Curated annotation (Swiss-Prot):
This is Nonsense-mediated mRNA decay factor SMG8. Keywords: Nonsense-mediated mRNA decay. The lineage of its organism: Eukaryota, Metazoa, Ecdysozoa, Arthropoda, Hexapoda. It comes from the Eukaryota. PANTHER family: AMPLIFIED IN BREAST CANCER 2-RELATED, NONSENSE-MEDIATED MRNA DECAY FACTOR SMG8. Residues 574-586 have a biased composition (Acidic residues). The keyword DNA repair does not apply. It comes from Drosophila persimilis. Residues 595-604 have a biased composition (Polar residues).
C-alpha cells in the first residue's frame, strides 16, 4: 500500500494479504461498481474518491481494477469500458489499421455500444451499488437508451440461460433465481459543476435536487425503475441523495495551469479593509504593505461553508448508501412493494469472487468465441452469443424499417408514373422522382443500399417488356418502338413536313433512320402523290449496278477516312501525267492537252426516259480531278479560265464564250484504232458501293446505291412571273414575300472560230443561232435563280443574302443575284417563322429559270460541311446541262453522310458564324453553247470529245 491508504489490483489477481483482510469482513462486504465516462489517459474514474491506478497501469477494454480501503466494508470495482476516451481511442486505432476496410462510423458506434452494455450487465449482476461517473455537467439522455437495452437483454437473453447454466455452479446457489446480488442502487457522480452558478451550499444542493427530479422522471417514464424490485432493472433511494456534483475539488487538473495559478496567487496581495483609527499605526510601517496579509482575513471566512466543503465529498456521499446495505434496509429504502424475503445478498470475498468469475466468463471473456460455442451446448446461450449485438442494434432496425417503407414508396411511385413504353431518359426521370419519394421516409446508413436496390428493381421493371428501342434517327431522335418486340422499321414519332422533288406538293415525313429513307424513299413516295412529279423528266444520276448478289459496302480507314482517298487521287494523277515533269509544252498546247484529257474521262449515263428536253452533259475539265475545293475567288477565276480555254481579261463585266467547231459525223471517225481508251479512273466497281454520298475525295469507281440528289425540269420558263413570284398552286409552303427568284443578267460575248471554218459550216447552224449571230457578238442572258430553304415545319423561303431572308421585291436589287451566286451560301439558317423553338431551315432546292438563248446553263453544286471538310458533289463525272427557256429545280440531299459516319446538323447556329453547319460553295453555274449536232437523247453513246467545253459563270 505504501503511502496510499488503499489497496488496488487487477481482477482476478488479488494479493494474498488483501484477500486475508477481506475474509475477515465475512458477509459484510458491499461491492460498489464504478462505471461511466472518463477523459484521462489512464481511464481513471476513481479520482473523486481520492484513488488512482498504478503508474504502470495500461487501460484495456473489459478490464476490472479493484480498490479497497482498509477499515471499511466497501470494495470498489472500477470498470474500464468503451465509454472511456482512452479505450475508445484504442478501438479507433485498431479499426483504422485494418487493411482495405473503410471506417464505418455507424458500425463502429454500434460495436462500442454493445461492448459497453455487456460490461453494464456484468456490473448489474455482481454489484450492490452502481456509481455512474459523468464528465459533463448535465445528465446524458443516451444513458436511458442504454438502460432500456440492458433491460431488454436481461429479460430476453440472460434470464433464458443464466439460471440453468449457474445452477450447476456454486454461484447459482448464492445468487438465487434472479442471478444477481440484488436490484442494484444506482448513483450519479458529476465530476464538474456548472461554472455559471455559485459554489455555495444552496446553489450546489439546488442543482443536485433538480437533476435528481429529472433523472427520476425519465427512469420512471421508461420503466427502468418501478415500485417492485423484481420488475425493476435498477433502484433509486427514496429519501436519500443519489446525485453528487463535485463543486470544490478540481479533478484531473492540468499541472501546468495549476503552477501558473499558484504563481499568480503568490505574487498578488489582497488589500485588507483598513479602519481610520489604524492609520497612525500604518504610518509606522517601514514600507507599504508591511502588515497586509497574503489572503482573505480570517473574519471573512464562513465556518459553515468550510464545514460543508469538508463533508461534501464523494466518499461520504457513497458511505451513506453503503450503510443502508449493511443495516439491511436497502430494499425498503428503494421500493414501496418490498418482497417477503429480502433479495439483498451480502457475500464474503471468496463467494463473491467465485460468482463474478463465472459471470465474467459467460458474459464478457468467452462471449463470441468459437470455444464457448463448442463448450456450452445450451441453445439459448448460443443464440445469445450469435445474435446479441444484432438484437441490440435498434438503430439499425429503425433505419432498416424506414428504408423499407421508403423503398415501397419509391417503387410504387415509379410504377405508377411509368408509361407502357419509355426510353432511358424517361427511365432516369422516373428514377429521380422515385428517389425523391424514397427520401420522404427512407434515411440513415442503409439508405444508399436501399436506393441501389430500388434502382435495380426499377431497372428490371423497365426491361420487362417496357424498354424502348431508342435507336437514334438521323436527326438524333430515339425510336419509340418496343425493344424486345420485332418491328419492320424504326419510328421516333416525330413528323416533319417536307416538299417533293418538284416542290409542288408537301407531305408528312417520318423521322428518317437511314440514308436511303431520308434522301430517296420519301421522295419516291411523294412522286406517287404529286401530279407534277409524275410528268416531269428527271436527270438520272449514276448509281451502283451490281453484276451479282455478292456485293458489299466499301471499307474505309475510320481514323483517317480522307487521307487514304487523297493519296489514291494523287497517285492516279501521277499515272495520268507520267511525263509532266520531263517535258515542258507551250502554253497553248498544254491547255489543249489538258482539255482533251478532262473531256475524255466522262462516264456514260443512261437516257432520260426518251426525253425531248435539250439536256446534255459536258466535262468540267480539271474541276473533276480537284483534290481540294476552291474556297477563294482567285482559285475560282483561275479554274474558269482553264476550263473554257479563253481569257476574260478584255472585260470585267463580260463573259467570253468561244464557239466550238461542229463535230464531224460519227461514221467518219469510227476507226477502232483511233478511239482513245478510257482512263482507269472512269471504270466503276460492280462489287463495292459507296455507303455515303459522293464527295471530292471519294474513292474513284465507287457509286452510291441510290441517288441523293434530284434534278428535274418542272416546265417552261413562262410558268414563273417575276411580278407575282411563285404561286401557292405551283410551289406551296412559301412564306409571304419570300417566294421570288432573283434575276441575274449575264453579259455574254461570243468569240467565233476561224473565217474558213465559219464560211464552210454556215449551213449547219440553226435559225435561232443565225438570228443571234446577226444581232451581233454580244448578248445579255436573263437568268432567274433562287436558293430555297425549308424547315421541319414545312416553311419555305428564299434568301437574298447569306445572312438575310428575302422580304419581297424591295430586297431585290440589280446585282443581288450576281453577289449571291458568287458567295458561299449557308447550308442551315434559322427559320423566320414565329415559334417557341428555334427551328433551323436547310438549303433544300435551287431554282433556275434558263434564258431563251442558244446556250445551256450547267450546274455543278458543291456542299462543304463536316469537321473533316467533306465537299459533296452530284457524283457525275460530267455535270448536267439545263435546256433553254425552262424551269429547273435541283433538290439537295436531306441528310449528308461521309465515308465513316453521319454529319448531323447543328443544334444551334451562332449569328456570327452561320457557316458552321456547312455551306454551298460559290461558282456552281456554268454556260456552254448549244450544239444541234449532238443526239442528246442517247448520251451514253456519244464520244467524250463531242461533249465540248463550257465556261464557268
Amino acid at each position: 500500500m505504501g503511502l496510499k491508504d488503499y489497496y488496488t489490483w487487477t481482477f482476478p489477481n488479488i494479493p494474498e494479504h488483501v484477500a486475508q483482510e477481506l475474509d475477515q469482513l465475512g458477509r459484510s462486504l458491499v461491492v460498489v461498481g464504478v462505471i461511466g465516462r472518463s477523459r484521462c489517459v489512464l481511464a481513471n474514474k476513481m479520482r473523486a474518491f481520492g484513488m488512482e491506478p498504478p503508474v504502470d497501469h495500461e487501460p484495456t477494454d473489459g478490464q476490472l481494477q479493484c480498490y479497497y480501503k482498509p477499515g471499511s466494508s466497501t470494495l470498489l470495482l472500477h470498470f474500464e469500458t468503451t465509454f472511456d476516451d482512452a479505450i475508445l481511442g484504442q478501438q479507433i486505432d485498431e479499426t483504422m489499421e485494418q487493411d482495405g476496410a473503410p471506417f464505418d462510423f455507424d458500425g463502429f458506434y454500434e460495436r462500442m455500444k454493445c461492448r459497453f452494455v455487456r460490461m453494464m450487465l456484468l456490473a448489474l449482476h455482481v454489484c450492490h451499488i452502481l456509481v455512474y461517473v459523468e464528465t459533463g455537467q448535465t445528465f446524458d439522455l443516451s444513458l436511458v437508451t442504454i438502460f432500456q437495452l440492458m433491460k431488454f437483454a436481461r429479460e430476453q437473453h440472460l434470464m433464458q440461460f443464466l439460471p440453468s447454466l449457474l445452477k450447476e455452479t456454486p454461484a447459482g446457489r448464492l445468487l438465487g433465481e434472479k442471478c444477481r446480488l440484488c436490484t442494484p442502487r444506482i448513483l450519479f457522480l458529476f465530476e464538474n459543476f456548472t461554472h455559471e452558478e455559485g459554489k455555495t451550499r444552496e446553489c450546489v444542493s439546488a442543482c443536485e435536487f433538480q437533476t435528481e427530479d429529472s433523472i427520476y422522471e425519465l427512469l420512471r417514464h421508461h420503466q427502468i425503475i418501478t415500485n417492485s424490485s423484481s420488475s425493476s432493472l435498477l433502484a433509486l433511494p427514496n429519501n436519500k441523495q443519489f446525485v453528487f456534483y463535485n463543486a470544490h475539488d478540481q479533478l484531473h487538473a492540468d499541472r501546468l495551469l495549476q503552477s501558473i495559478e499558484f504563481l499568480n496567487l503568490d505574487m498578488r496581495k489582497l488589500d485588507v479593509k483598513e479602519e481610520e483609527d489604524d492609520l497612525e499605526v500604518l504610518e509606522l510601517a517601514p514600507f507599504d504593505g508591511f502588515v497586509k496579509s497574503f489572503g482573505e482575513s480570517f473574519e471573512s471566512t464562513n465556518y459553515e461553508e468550510q464545514q460543508y466543503k469538508t463533508e461534501h465529498t464523494a466518499w461520504h456521499f457513497l458511505q451513506r448508501h453503503v450503510q443502508d446495505a449493511l443495516l439491511g434496509c436497502f430494499d425498503e429504502g428503494s421500493f414501496k412493494q418490498v418482497p417477503q424475503r429480502g433479495q439483498l445478498q451480502l457475500l464474503n470475498a471468496q463467494e463473491w469472487h467465485d460468482c463474478i468469475a463465472e459471470l465474467h466468463k459467460l458474459l464478457v471473456s468467452s462471449a463470441g468465441t468459437q470455444e464457448s460455442l463448442n463448450e456450452i451446448r445450451n441453445e439459448d446461450y448460443q443464440v445469445f452469443l450469435q445474435s446479441f449485438d444484432e438484437s441490440l442494434n435498434y438503430e439499425k432496425k429503425f433505419w432498416a424499417h424506414l428504408c423499407e417503407i421508403g423503398l415501397k414508396m419509391g417503387i410504387e411511385a415509379y410504377k405508377k408514373a411509368a408509361p407502357a413504353i419509355y426510353g432511358s431518359s424517361m427511365h432516369q426521370q422516373l428514377l429521380a422522382e422515385a428517389t425523391l419519394a424514397f427520401e420522404e421516409e427512407g434515411r440513415g446508413p442503409p439508405a444508399e443500399a436501399s436506393i441501389a436496390k430500388m434502382t435495380a428493381t426499377c431497372l428490371r421493371h423497365w426491361q420487362d417488356g417496357r424498354q424502348q428501342c431508342e435507336q437514334l434517327s438521323l436527326r438524333s431522335q430515339p425510336c419509340t418502338q418496343p425493344k424486345e418486340m420485332p418491328h419492320d422499321k424504326h419510328n421516333s414519332g416525330v413528323i416533319h413536313v417536307s416538299s417533293c422533288n418538284c416542290g409542288r406538293t408537301q407531305g408528312r415525313r417520318e423521322d428518317p433512320f437511314s440514308l436511303r429513307q431520308a434522301n430517296y424513299e420519301f421522295y419516291e413516295h411523294m412522286v406517287k402523290m404529286c401530279n407534277l412529279c409524275v410528268k416531269v423528266k428527271q436527270f438520272k444520276f449514276p448509281i451502283f449496278e451490281p453484276t451479282n448478289n455478292e456485293y458489299r459496302a466499301a471499307a474505309f480507314e475510320v481514323a483517317f477516312p480522307l487521307l487514304h482517298a487523297g493519296k489514291n487521287r494523287l497517285a492516279q494523277d501521277a499515272e495520268l501525267d507520267p511525263d509532266e515533269e520531263d517535258e515542258e509544252l507551250p502554253t497553248g498546247e498544254r491547255e489543249e492537252q489538258h482539255i482533251t484529257q478532262s473531256n475524255g474521262c466522262s462516264q456514260p449515263l443512261s437516257p432520260t426516259f426518251g426525253s425531248d428536253l435539250n439536256m446534255s452533259i459536258a466535262g468540267f475539265g480539271v474541276s473533276l480531278n480537284e483534290s481540294e475545293p476552291c474556297f477563294d475567288q482567285s482559285s475560282s477565276s483561275e479554274a474558269e479560265s482553264t476550263c473554257s480555254g479563253t481569257s476574260s481579261e478584255e472585260s470585267n463585266n463580260e463573259l467570253v464564250l468561244q464557239l466550238k467547231e461542229p463535230a464531224k459525223k460519227h461514221e467518219e471517225s469510227c476507226d477502232p484504232d483511233s478511239i482513245a481508251p478510257l482512263p482507269s479512273m472512269c471504270l466503276t466497281s460492280t462489287t463495292e458501293y459507296l455507303p455515303g454520298l459522293v464527295h471530292t475525295l471519294s474513292k474513284v469507281g465507287l457509286l452510291p446505291l441510290f441517288p441523293s440528289w434530284s434534278l428535274a425540269c418542272v416546265g417552261p420558263s413562262s410558268i414563273y412571273s417575276h411580278n407575282t413570284g411563285l404561286q401557292e398552286h405551283f410551289q406551296s409552303g412559301f412564306l409571304s414575300g419570300a417566294n421570288f427568284l432573283l434575276p441575274w443578267d449575264v453579259q455574254l460575248r461570243l468569240v467565233h472560230a476561224s473565217k474558213h471554218y465559219h464560211n464552210s459550216h454556215q449551213p449547219h447552224m440553226s435559225k435561232k443561232q443565225q438570228r443571234y449571230r446577226k444581232h451581233g457578238d454580244r448578248m445579255v442572258l436573263k437568268i432567274f435563280v433562287g436558293f430555297e430553304y425549308e424547315c421541319s415545319r414545312g416553311h419555305r423561303f428564299m434568301m437574298c443574302r447569306p445572312d438575310r431572308v428575302l422580304r419581297g421585291g424591295a430586297d431585290i436589287e440589280r446585282d443581288t443575284c450576281s453577289k449571291m451566286v458568287h458567295t458561299n451560301m449557308p447550308l442551315y439558317y434559322p427559320c423566320p417563322c414565329r415559334s417557341q423553338n428555334n427551328y433551323l431551315a436547310q438549303l433544300m432546292r435551287i431554282h433556275v429559270v434558263t434564258p431563251k438563248a442558244p446556250v445551256n446553263i450547267i450546274v455543278d453544286p458543291k456542299v462543304c460541311m463536316g469537321k473533316d471538310k467533306y465537299t459533296f458533289t452530284l457524283g457525275s463525272m460530267v455535270p448536267p446541262r439545263l435546256s433553254q427557256s425552262a424551269y429547273w429545280i435541283l433538290r439537295l440531299p436531306y441528310v449528308y453522310q461521309g465515308d465513316d459516319a453521319l454529319i448531323a446538323p447543328p443544334e444551334k447556329l451562332e449569328p456570327d458564324d452561320i457557316m458552321a453547319g456547312g455551306y454551298l460553295l460559290a461558282g456552281m453555274f456554268g454556260i456552254a453553247e448549244t450544239d444541234p449536232t449532238l443526239d442528246l437523247n442517247d448520251q451514253g453513246h456519244l464520244d467524250t470529245n463531242e461533249l465540248g467545253t463550257f465556261t464557268r459563270i
